[in-house]
Amino acid sequence: KQEVAEIAQLAEHHFVGVKCGIMDQYACMFGIEGHALKLDCRTLQYEHQKIILGDYQLVLIDSKVKHELTSTEYNKRREECERALSVLKKYDPALVTLRDVTQDHLTNFGKDLDPIAFKRCDYVIKENRRVNEACQALNANDLQLFGALIYQSHEGLAHDYEVSCGELNFLVDATRKSDHI
């Protein structure tokens, strides 16, 4: 399964032209019903986080928005993150990926980042923290906290990483207006 995921990622890189990560491929190969998949993209270690819904239901909505990563800003976002990392590495050579960057790094050395690179780096730091908090919420069966973190994740994607679209923003805003979601 891991080899299939890695081959699929390489196909995206070489034939599609998108320097994507491996999360989607891993989710397809290793996802199991009733669980979220927490993936460490550095080590490729993963764990399944059981989702106990109780009286809740999980609803997925197809926005009907079609896109290809080659025509989106995906590669540009990768470049912006890599640029931020290269600047921060001047202060801390032990940094390997943006995952290693802490809020302290950003506070102390972020002045040398352009505003866009700073925003992208800040998003990655916060999103990594949210993933861990979301797993803790699932383990504690705290679905309200989990839902709040999902909303925060969307806000970060929309405003800090700038990869959302009007249709998704509309759907998220519509769900927020309901007392039942």
Residue ranges and their predicted role:
Residues 1-50, 177-179:
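Gly/Ser-rich oxyanion-binding loop with an adjacent helix/lid
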Residues 35-181:
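C-terminal nucleotide
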